[in-house]
Amino acid sequence: MAKKSMIEREKKRARLVEKYAAKREALKEAFHQAEDYEEKIEIHRQLQQLPRNSSPNRRRNRCWATGRPRGYYRDFGLSRNVLREWAHEGLLPGVVKSSW
């Protein structure tokens, strides 16, 4: 189980990404549309004024059951450990053990 502080930090990042997504997208679009060098610098400064954690790149996928950041399967939103346990218990519909 991940530390609660790390899980909460990720939740905070998710909230910030959602809050500033429209503003960040508008600034990026304005940056690409700008032709004047000075204007681009000003837009870039405005982008830098946004909180660091509002950037989608700073988010980390975490298992929603345990909070584990590594071994994450996007299709399920689970870490490899939980995926294996739940698949063996039959808690994941459609997941069957491979045999050939």
From Swiss-Prot:
Extract the GO molecular function terms from the UniProt entry: rRNA binding; structural constituent of ribosome
Give a Gene Ontology cellular component term annotated to this protein: cytoplasm
Task: From the UniProt record, give one GO term of the biological process aspect.
Answer: translation
Matches recorded under Gene3D superfamilies: 1.10.287.1480
Give yes or no: UniProt keyword RNA-binding: yes
PROSITE patterns referenced in this protein's UniProt entry, alphabetically = RIBOSOMAL_S14 (PS00527)
What quaternary structure, including any partners, is listed in this protein's UniProt entry?
Answer: Part of the 30S ribosomal subunit. Contacts proteins S3 and S10.
Name of the protein: Small ribosomal subunit protein uS14
What organism does this protein naturally occur in? Rippkaea orientalis (strain PCC 8801 / RF-1)
